[in-house]
Amino acid sequence: MKTSAQQLLSLLLLPLSAIAAPTGEIEARACSTVTVIFARGTTETPTLGTVIGPQFLAALKSSFGGSVTMNGVPYAADVPGFLKGGDPTGSKVMANMVSSALSSCPNTKLVISGYSQGGQLVHNAAKQLPAATTAKIAAAVIFGDPDNGSPVQGVPAAKTKIICHAGDNICQHGSMILMPHLTYGMDATAAAAFVKQVAGS
């Protein structure tokens, strides 16, 4: 029989396992019609950011009747990661999150998406996934893509939407954050309509 002290220790240790370093596993929950794995941009607040993540989620919920889950990738989102072509650890975590989501909810419409450095993570994660996994991705949507012009490996061009504003230096493979890079919230509705079109209801 456990002593009261042992029982207390067990209760104290239980939450620690729940907040271990992120591995990319998706928390068990009821499966949604649409599941989005989203990577925010450099210096944005975890985990969906503010420029487009929340707006895109709201637009998707409107399009799909609310049955949408968006999981933000937990990663540093710092400048060194951007300069490396996308945070390596975050890229791996995103790939793991895609695999986990499809394993947990094989019938969900899986969307991979990112903004700014998050777009780099989308490209990197897709390269790390086997073809059998990328074949199950319903759509890829990137806003302000630093890798503009490059395909998302394994995802057909018809299921990929890269949104880049005129004058966005990041989309021109630069490193300057100009006003056009901060206005992608206006594209949330169009992006959601694209997902609806290619993924179906």
Curated annotation (Swiss-Prot):
Keywords noted in UniProt: Disulfide bond, Hydrolase, Secreted, Serine esterase, Signal, Virulence
Active site: 116, 168, 181
Catalytic activity: cutin + H2O = cutin monomers
EC number of the protein: 3.1.1.74
GO molecular function: cutinase activity
PTMs per UniProt: The 2 disulfide bonds play a critical role in holding the catalytic residues in juxta-position; reduction of the disulfide bridges results in the complete inactivation of the enzyme.
Location(s) in or outside the cell: Secreted
Location, primary (coarse class): secreted
Protein name according to UniProt: Cutinase
Gene symbol of the encoding locus: CUT1
